[in-house]
Amino acid sequence: MSYFSTSVSEVIEGGVNLRGYSLAEIMKKATYTQGAFLSLTGRLPDEAETRLVDGVLTSLLDHGYVASTITAARYIASGNPQFIPAVAGGILAAGSNTLSPEHSFHLLDHTDELRGDGTFEEGAERVVEEYVSQKKRLPGFGHPTHKTSDFRADVLFDLAEELGLDGSSIKQIQAINRAFIAKTGKTNIPINIDGALAAIGRDLGWSANQTVAFAVLSVLPGLMAHVIEEIETGRPLRYIQDGDYVGEPLAKKL
């Protein structure tokens, strides 16, 4: 038995079998969105899904220095002006607090469990009660810049509705938003782009990891653009000049 086995691809003389399709045919007849969808999920998207995933893949193209991925990548490029290490370092800055929709995805999984045979509103009320009572932050909600509404989430939700792809996960996360406002009175913690991507990914039948993969694909062009700019026009060896020391005063003797 071979050391590796895979259902993703097979390289043969003169071609590549990607999920049962000829890569040469994909190159000629498919878009990048369709090819990425096929590679990650094992199937080709239909026309409506392709259009929605086009929106997904442009939703995180750039968000400036608000994104820790950009700041990290530019610092790395400043100290080590090489493209690939800086891009890789930027991706490593993604996680539970930025970019990754994985935690929002699992919130929706948990809400489904709490809802059982109940309504979206009942599921939302139960999960909000749990998180608020335990003083836990709801993943997929809130943004440091977009206080009342994350326009990227709004655009994707509108597009999903227009295309007939606003499924149960979108409806559920919107119900969670309403329940949170009703419970706390806070209107400045909207559904953010991570929450929107998680809901859309679930409605498209993606796994949590597949949803994260599409988020990373979305952020890469902007991240790479910042790395290129930093290498070509930025300051060498950026550093933070100001920092408050909060330790003991310099008074000890050895």
Question: Regions from the language model: what does each represent?
Answer:
Residues M1-L254:
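Non-transmembrane, aqueous-exposed alpha-helical and coiled segments at domain scale
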